[in-house]
Regions:
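NAD(P)+-binding Rossmann beta1-loop-alpha1 motif at the extreme N-terminus of oxidoreductases
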Residues: 1-74, 138, 171-172, 203, ...
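Rossmann-fold dinucleotide-binding core
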Residues: 8-9, 109-192
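Rossmann-like NAD(P)-binding element
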Residues: 13, 55-113, 142, 146-149
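Anion (oxyanion) recognition and catalysis
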Residues: 23, 51, 123, 164-165, ...
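Hydrophobic beta-strand scaffold residues
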Residues: 57, 128-130, 275
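Helical "substrate-binding/catalytic lid" subdomain
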Residues: 178-309
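NAD(P)-dependent dehydrogenase/reductase Rossmann-like domain
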Residues: 268, 285-360
Length: 360
């Protein structure tokens, strides 16, 4: 039997490719997709793809949930603060015409605390909840090989697995509702530490050899050196865009990455890891916060930090980070990294969350 879904975030880079991957008569189909109405060529293509899939495009949550003719709601949206707002608006509407026990499949990257609080809140509302974060970027979503980090109810995973295998590469990490979020943040530790390593090397190469950061010689150098023991995928998927093509506004965008770094720092702290694990995440979060402040209104991806790491710019980055990092007080450093963010990004972090946060 085909699973009937409605979706929030269907115009985004990670969920929109599902419109073409899920075929008629398959394991699942989307009945309706919520559209915030942002106009550009990419989203227009997404709208057409969803229409070709057979989904109706709707502009409010009330129409999205309709008369309760769906099995589950798929949400692939923002961070804790963004998605908490969605849940507050959505759940009362789901309750109004609830025909059975629906589920929410939450694909966003949120903190482990969010996943637990959402589960506790929705369980009391008679709604099943699972958080399956995605990793692999827009290309992974487009090619249906992104990793889907699943956990929580085994019966829900078994029901969804054929659908998940159609849009990506799922792996189930057990019955803990927070395991998917935790695994995603483990991956982000690898991403951000790899990013700092390759950016440090690129900045040092520029200074030692007295060369520009970008250019064909730099690209050839790191194509070679990245084949050694220090190789990282952050060369291929991130900084090579800047070094090879002088492109700094495409990739993992800083306003999203900074929140993930804070979530990773918080999780490491909660699980008792040493400052050696936590402080680098705070430092990279502050580096991203510095970019957001220095280049306010200019879209920049994470690898743009390398431009602040060369000698002529390094003092500005140092001055900013040393204001906020306290190596002897990890908790204060995490709080300071949040306080340093622009307000709109700060609101999305929402580290302090419990089940009462979702009450409208």
């Amino acid at each position: 039997m085909t699973i009937k879904l409605v979706g929030i975030g269907g115009m985004g880079l990670m969920l929109s490719p599902s419109a073409k991957h899920l075929k008629p008569g398959g394991h699942a189909r989307f009945l309706r997709i919520h559209d915030r109405g942002t106009k550009d060529d990419r989203r227009d293509m997404c709208r057409q793809a969803w229409k070709d899939h057979g989904a109706d495009i709707v502009h409010d949550y009330e129409t999205l949930v309709g008369d309760g003719d769906y099995d589950g709601v798929v949400i692939c949206a923002g961070k804790n603060g963004d998605d908490c707002d969605i849940f507050r608006a959505l759940v009362p509407l789901m309750q109004r015409n609830k025909k059975s026990q629906p589920f929410i499949l939450h694909l966003s990257t949120v903190s482990a605390g969010f996943a637990q609080a959402a589960y506790d809140f929705l369980s009391a509302e008679g709604i099943d909840y699972v958080n399956y974060p995605l990793t692999g970027g827009p290309l992974g979503a487009e090619n249906a090989n992104m990793l889907i980090l699943a956990s929580g109810s085994e019966s829900i995973y078994s029901k969804l697995e054929p659908t998940l295998q159609t849009i990506g590469n799922p792996k189930y990490f057990g019955s803990s509702v927070t395991a998917g979020a935790e695994v995603k943040l483990m991956g982000q530790l690898m991403v951000f530490n790899g990013l700092v390593g390759i950016c440090s090397a690129a900045a040092l190469k520029s200074e030692c050899f007295q060369e520009e950061l970008s250019g064909s010689e730099q690209a050839e150098f790191f194509d070679f050196l990245n084949g050694g023991a220090g190789g990282t995928r952050q060369w291929d998927v991130a900084i090579s865009k800047g070094v090879r093509d002088n492109t700094w506004d495409q990739g993992f965008m800083t306003q999203h990455a900074v929140v993930d770094a804070i979530y990773a720092a918080k999780l490491c702290r909660e699980r008792g890891l040493p400052a050696l694990a936590v402080i680098p995440m705070v430092a990279i979060a502050l580096a991203f916060a510095y970019l957001l402040k220095k280049y306010e209104g200019t879209p920049l991806a994470t690898h743009a930090i390398v431009r602040e790491m060369i000698q002529k710019n390094a003092s500005g980055l140092d001055d900013f980070t040393t204001q906020h990092i306290n190596y002897t007080d990890v908790d204060a450093s995490i709080k300071n990294s949040i306080a340093a963010l622009p307000q709109r990004v700060k609101d999305s972090v929402m580290l302090d969350i419990n089940k009462d946060s979702f009450s409208a």
